Amino acid sequence: FMWSLGNEAGDGTAFTAMKQAALALDDTRQFHYEGDFDLTKSDVISRMYPTADVMEKLGKKEPITISLYDNIANQLAADSKPITAEMYEGKPVLLCEYAHSMENSLGNFADYMADFEKYDNMCGGFIWDFVDQALHRKAQDGTDLWLYGTDFEKEEPRHWYSLPNTTAITGSNTYFCANGIIGADRTVHPQYYEVQKVYAPVQTLAVNPDSGSFTVKNKMLFTNINALECRWQIEVGGRLLMHGKLEPIDCPPLSEVTVSLPYTMDQVTGLTVSFATTRALPGLASGFTFAWDQFVLRPMPQPVAEKDGGDLHYDHRGNRVEVQGADFDLTIQNGRVVSWVIDGSQRLVAPLEPAYFRALTDNDIDFLNFVPPLIKFHPLYGWRRAQRRTHALRTVVQAGADNTVEVHIAMSTPRLREDLITYKIYPNGRLYVYHSAVPKQDMLRFGFQMTLPGSYEYVNWYGRGPHPSYRDRKTGAALGRYQSTVTALEHRYMRPQESSNRTDTYDLYLCDSHGEGFRVQAYYETPFAFSAYHYTTMGLDKAAHIHEIPYDPSLTTLNIDGAQCGVGGDLPGQGAVRAPYRVTAGEKCSYAFILEPMHKKK
């Protein structure tokens, strides 16, 4: 427990007087104040929202200077103070606010924990924040409304002297009140599970997985690990092969031990080690999974296209190719699969086509969060236009091995160069899809999208889950075999945005109640990400509230992504996605997957 002298209130002699008054009441506690520029009042070096380079300087106790931008920001709300090498003496580093969890956010959270554990002078930090703020109302038809800012300010005057972060144009911070790891209705956001995993007080590390040797680290201050039950299980593609429990592990607080797990590795395997409570504790039920870690002991098996002796026929005219098999007809036009008739039934509501846009997250919107009327002019909408304007320059068709037909297409797409698509059609109806390109600007996503019948509601996948994950927020999403519905895949934030992605997927089924649908398989060792929902991406992006999402029961949108930009979270309401998690300009993107039609069960 520490004394706090307040928050974001500037600096001055009043804080010295406050400290003296507090010491007179209790002189046994340390003091915290982030706005202390000369560090005469605070017993810790307190920072808000440090970026990766600032974290490294803080950990290495290096001087920190501030820029002109920092000086300007300091006049508004920030406290980005300079730090000299001498100031580190006897003062640990504490992040009084970090990991800004503004709706679909909290990216690279695990990277912060890695820094906390790497540097001895790091105390940790406080996530901003715990719960969204919104007002609940019921519409006349009973629909739940979660309202914010401008929903209540139609009569309020707009003042010319309002600060930018109170938005003179709108009179409020609008949805900037949605920063929690749980929702205003106390439903859990996906980032909650990321926090739960990253903050887990027990960690298992591989020593020699081939022989079953692992190190268990106890990060708890007062509890021996023998109070928990250690469980392990081995799976192949989500199918359980072996499982067991260890005898209680004697590992005192802040220590580590080596354990041996009694498994064999004759097949492609993945291992999960977990620790669970053995009795009910305050706030925790007996059997609650306290901590877990996963290890890929062997790579996933690769899909093998079944050889089929059937014949394919095709007709090629310009940028249009029609392919006929025994029970299907597939048409490619202008780089898109525009028709796919299987067993006499059209499977596509809208084409299988390249996709580069996502419904903008709060962090994607960046500084325009402070000026909402200008969001529609955001440069990232250029990717939406690029997606609409992509077209084929040249289409080449050739007969491939095993009676296949290969279609190679050179595409022209704004913001991309060297844009190439290959479709390979097998006699049994399977479709191999390959796409490569080099972005001229950082991308939101590099993938394909197809619109299927709304009856395609049932989902089964092997990948990370069960909740949504992104390339910079997937530590807390375990690899496994999951099943759900398209409706349940959706996660709702207060302001609708990209939200339902599942990363590191190797195998996906999307079917109706009769088993008709599609299977998607990763090709070689590169998994894909997917999302599915009963509305369009553009409709999601236009909605300002949950109740405004234009649900359409007649369609299911399926996204199959080779890459998607992370969600970020280093800075409040700003992109700041770290370099490893971007889809970076100038770096070639490529991926492949296999689409297989699933027929109705007989």
Features from the language model and the residues they span:
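A broad, structural surface signal
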Residues: 16, 20, 110-117, 193, ...
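Short beta-turn/strand-loop junction motif enriched in small, turn-promoting residues
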Residues: 100, 112-113, 219-221, 412, ...
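Beta-sheet entry/capping signal
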Residues: 2, 29-32, 44, 92-93, ...
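Carbohydrate-binding surfaces of carbohydrate-active enzymes
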Residues: 115-337, 433
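Active-site-proximal structural scaffolding
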Residues: 11, 15, 38, 89, ...
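Beta-strand/loop-rich accessory regions of lumenal/periplasmic or secreted enzymes
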Residues: 262-266, 296-602
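Flexible loop/turn segments at secondary-structure boundaries
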Residues: 9-13, 39-41, 53-54, 101-103, ...
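Substrate-binding/catalytic cleft of secreted carbohydrate-active enzymes
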Residues: 1-173, 177
